[in-house]
Amino acid sequence: MKFSMNGMLFAMSSALDAVESEIFDVATFHSKRVACLSILLGAKMGYSGEALSDLAGAAVMHDNALTEYVAARRLLGNQTTASSIELGSHCEMGERNMCVLPFYDHIKGAVLYHHENADGSGPFRKTAAETPMYAQLIHLADQLDNSFHLNTMSPGKYASVLAWLEENRGTQFAPAVTDLFADAVPIEAAEKMEGTQVSSALSALLPVYTPDYDNETVVSISTVFARIVDFKSHFTSTHSLGIAEKAAEMGRYYGENEDICTRLF
């Protein structure tokens, strides 16, 4: 089945952004800006084509377990705030969800280690030398947007960004990554990520990529996304997944082939 993986990932990012905005008070379209920044940095490092597409997928899904994490804390009677997030648990949940994606072997560790600092002070105590490069790029992009709310840009803000990166060079971020930023993300590129235009900016940065996936893979991917949506509220619980399963069952009952049943799911 021809399946636009990036299209589905970017659609899911809107739901994830809504949750992250609630909890962390980050600006909307956060996931897409993290993807844009990661792609620009990755391209400057020499990645291209499918490698950039994989990086974008990991970047846009870097906080995919946030809804699940919030739901787990809710069951324990705990409220979730930015200061109460246990980064290690949140990252482990997210990495587990990424395992079903067909390009997982290319992005292994990107979500798990995206909160690691270059000096080894992150949740898993990994230094830059021990952290996958995709995770390092996503970490910088994530922290940058969280700190500066890059939904708006100005010369003054851009200068503050460069100063902040220099201040955190070698501690939060590896010099090999921070030193690329000014060339990889000039102010003109940052301005294209403002507000709703970030969606167009992201589309322009990525190649069109719609590979064939077997039905089992498509169902596995869809199951993860259904879980993410369902964890958004205790009222929905397993609602999306339940509807999908019943739709596929009805298709089989009426004699549809597995391709049609997968599309129904």
Task: List each model region and its residues.
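Histidine- and acidic-residue-rich, metal-dependent catalytic cores
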Residues: 2-265
